[in-house]
Amino acid sequence: MTNVNVDVTPLTTKPSQDGFYMPAEWAAQQAVWMIWPYRPDNWRAAGAYAQATFAKVADAIGAATPVYMGVPKAFLAEAKAVMPSHVTLVEMDSNDCWARDTGPTVVVNDNGECRGVDWGFNAWGGHNGGLYFPWDKDEQVAQQMLAQHGFARYSAPLILEGGSIHVDGEGTCMTSAECLLNANRNPELTKEQIEDLLRDYLNVKQFIWLQDGVYMDETDGHIDNMSCFARPGEVILHWTDDETDPQYPRSKAALEVLQNTVDAKGRKLKIHLLPQPGPLYCSEEESKGVTEGTGVPRTAGERLAGSYVNFLITNHRIVFPLLDPATDDIAAQKLQEIFPEHEIVGVPAREILLGGGNIHCITQQIPAGK
């Protein structure tokens, strides 16, 4: 276990000025971060089921990449008992466990140096539809992770969660208007101003804007639940053939955008359709295990935003969520076709989904540089 309490004074320049850019997820990684789940008003049984699932995810990642886990001091003993021994536990306060959204975006330069972008965070909407209050500890997470690695920090003047962007490492950024243009994130900024800031801090040149994310996604449609890059020039899209499903018009509109766009290199996109599980719903028993608090209520019968797109690429391994016995094998086979050189590892992940996200949402990769 390590303890981090280091002030990382932000740089006064921007990554693009300094020759830094966000690499693609398939670039080599030196570590993956996770955070301990404990909120009783979001996780049933005060997180016990989720903690066991997080341990399985950490184990699946750890076979390919070192895993760090931020844990509040009060839960260190519990985490040590539950987590695999190879996981490095780091004492760290947080309001919840979404490392993708509260952690830093690590950028690299051509010499292999790493720095981190620390985005603004308001718990997916602040006082206008946000998912809990307060979020002050979450705002400190990125800085603490960067301090653990000794990386210099850029402080970006933009409310942004890591799950709301995907990049191909070659100048293209994919995102959703439902989230990034939502009035509860950066209402004072225009679309053009948001793009300018992403150019500054990710060093990207071309944007692919999908309108909406997955139906009932409480993050306001994060792109990482809806679509992602598989490699340069190739994307994966969450899909259903059921025209009566509320997801269908969302996926159909996204497909039309992807079919009629090019990336930063001018390439037409090859599109892989990944079938949705379910539909899946929260059960009465699952709902009863969540206590009342400032978190969003978990209501029995509510549709869950399940998606196989919410996987992590980490050092030639794909760690993806097992969500539905009827479609899990189909998803695994499709992922193996898309990633023939990767090992495809499924982890039962319904407990993460019940909390509002999945494997990509609870992880944040640290690129290796060179």
Swiss-Prot record:
The keyword Hydrolase applies. One of its GO terms (biological process) is putrescine biosynthetic process. InterPro entries: Agmatine_deiminase, Peptidyl-Arg-deiminase_porph. It is an enzyme of class 3 (hydrolase). Its EC number is 3.5.3.12. It comes from the Bacteria. Belongs to the agmatine deiminase family. This is Putative agmatine deiminase.
